[in-house]
Amino acid sequence: MGQKVNPIGLRLGINRNWSSRWFSVSQTTPSNILEDHKIRKFLKREMYYAGVSEFIIERAANKIRVTVVASRPGLIIGKKGVDIDKHKEALKKILHKEVFINIKEAKRPQANAQLAAENIATQLEKRVAFRRAMKKVMQAAMKAGAKGIKVKVSGRLAGAEMARTEWYMEGRVPLHTLRAKIDYGFAEAMTTYGIIGVKVWIFKGEVLHKGILPEKKEESKSGDKEVRSKSRRGRQ
């Protein structure tokens, strides 16, 4: 089950929080969900260059507060906040509601699963070899303090006629352990041969009520880091 389900949704209420944090009666819930979709779609398109990893939406009465978590917040704000004001006015015209936008800098962007997936997708679109792109992102995540990382790409890799799936894993990624803090990201690379899907799982430690458990040190005979990989061909 842990291999199939979204690891963030599986851990909601345990060590992860919702990205839409509001409550409404049943009559207004569908319209609120549609508004959240419009907000995320618009801001993702307008802020693609800033390395956005998450949009957190909160509601109070007829006001909407959006917190944007990005690796390069300065590009979103613009000179004297001009760019952010443009986004507010555009959303106000779309939703006919007052929208407040807060910018928050992403901590350790190299260990952020969504940013890592988008980084790999961008490299694939630039015709970088997929194995090189995967291993480069994995090394950066481990250096940034991740306990483990798993990367999977699916599609017509290297222009092959038959689609296949390949993945690499370094360290531990315990998807069945609910107290494990697992970050998950997904992105798509639009290549000349078709779409290549990229999935990234990053393990950041086990969480208890008192904090994060320290990682147990395991002595290795060889002393080298273990990197596992697997390839699987898809059906035509």
From Swiss-Prot:
Basic and acidic residues composition-biased segments: 214-229
Biological process (GO), any one: translation
UniProt cross-references to InterPro entries, sorted A to Z: KH_dom (IPR004087), KH_dom-like_a/b (IPR015946), KH_dom_type_2 (IPR004044), KH_sf_prok-type (IPR009019), Ribosomal_S3_C_sf (IPR036419), Ribosomal_uS3_bac-typ (IPR005704), Ribosomal_uS3_C (IPR001351), Ribosomal_uS3_CS (IPR018280)
Domain KH type-2 intervals: 39-107
Gene Ontology annotations for the cellular component aspect, listed alphabetically: cytosolic small ribosomal subunit
Keyword Metal-binding: no
Annotated spans, Disordered: 214-236
Lineage: superkingdom: Bacteria
Signal peptide start-end: none
Alphabetized CDD domains for the sequence: KH-II_30S_S3
Keywords: Ribonucleoprotein, Ribosomal protein, RNA-binding, rRNA-binding
Any one Gene Ontology molecular-function term assigned to this protein's record: mRNA binding
Pfam families with a match to the protein in the record: KH_2, Ribosomal_S3_C
Entry similarity comment: Belongs to the universal ribosomal protein uS3 family.
Function text: Binds the lower part of the 30S subunit head. Binds mRNA in the 70S ribosome, positioning it for translation.
Assembly, per entry: Part of the 30S ribosomal subunit. Forms a tight complex with proteins S10 and S14.
NCBIfam families (UniProt xref): rpsC_bact
Protein name as catalogued: Small ribosomal subunit protein uS3
Native species: Helicobacter hepaticus (strain ATCC 51449 / 3B1)
Gene: rpsC
